């Protein structure tokens, strides 16, 4: 039977922390070969993505829809986000991709808008920059609390709720698109509004291409 000391020699220290966080690593090391544990771990990660995609298809959530880009790849999703009512983004149908890391849910997915969107917290390449999608732990710049960043309890639904909230209430203090943030602060009902309206119209034209 393997001992805890044997586990320590087989697994790098950084990985010990990861598996301990799962709450099962050291227990499984007593009865499983490390390679078998890794296979079980990846299977567990897959199941965490397989269930929500089925659940969202059966019970859609207002404001967005989600599905796999490729039925054979659980780690790449496509989402359609409806611009929230009573905001400048109302009426928009914005397409985005979620790309999950292999060690999800320990680390967050990346989100990228495919539809053009003008927003302070979305950079010009479409990458979304909000706290919930930032790597877990302390913010070295001190802008975010650990509990505001990624936690393994978050789901696709909580991510999308945060993104919809971001559309309704941009964070101009921590922008990914500095030009959009400047316009949002200084000319919200002028140039910023015109650029958003153009993106909304374009999103409607290309939503189902």
Describe each region flagged by the PLM.
Residues 1-93, 97-209:
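UBC/E2-like fold recognition across ubiquitin and ubiquitin-like conjugation systems
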């Amino acid at each position: 039977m393997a001992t805890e000391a044997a586990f320590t020699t087989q697994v790098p220290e950084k990985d010990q922390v990861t598996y301990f966080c799962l709450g099962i690593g050291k227990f499984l090391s007593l009865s499983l070969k490390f390679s078998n544990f890794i296979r079980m771990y990846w299977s567990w990660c897959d199941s965490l993505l397989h269930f929500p995609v089925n659940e969202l298809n059966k019970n859609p959530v207002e404001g967005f829809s989600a599905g796999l880009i490729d039925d054979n790849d659980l780690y790449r999703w496509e989402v359609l986000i409806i611009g929230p009512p009573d905001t400048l983004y109302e009426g928009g149908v914005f397409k985005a991709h979620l790309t999950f890391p292999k060690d999800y849910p320990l680390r967050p997915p990346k989100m990228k808008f495919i539809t053009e969107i003008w927003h302070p917290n979305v950079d010009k390449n479409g990458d979304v920059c909000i706290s919930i999608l930032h790597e877990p732990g302390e913010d070295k710049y001190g802008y975010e609390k650990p509990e505001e960043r990624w936690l393994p309890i978050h789901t696709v639904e909580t991510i999308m709720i945060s993104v919809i909230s971001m559309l309704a209430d941009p964070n101009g203090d921590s922008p990914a698109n500095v030009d959009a943030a400047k316009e949002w602060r200084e000319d919200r009902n002028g140039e910023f509004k015109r650029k958003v309206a153009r993106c909304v119209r374009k999103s409607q034209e290309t939503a189902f291409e």
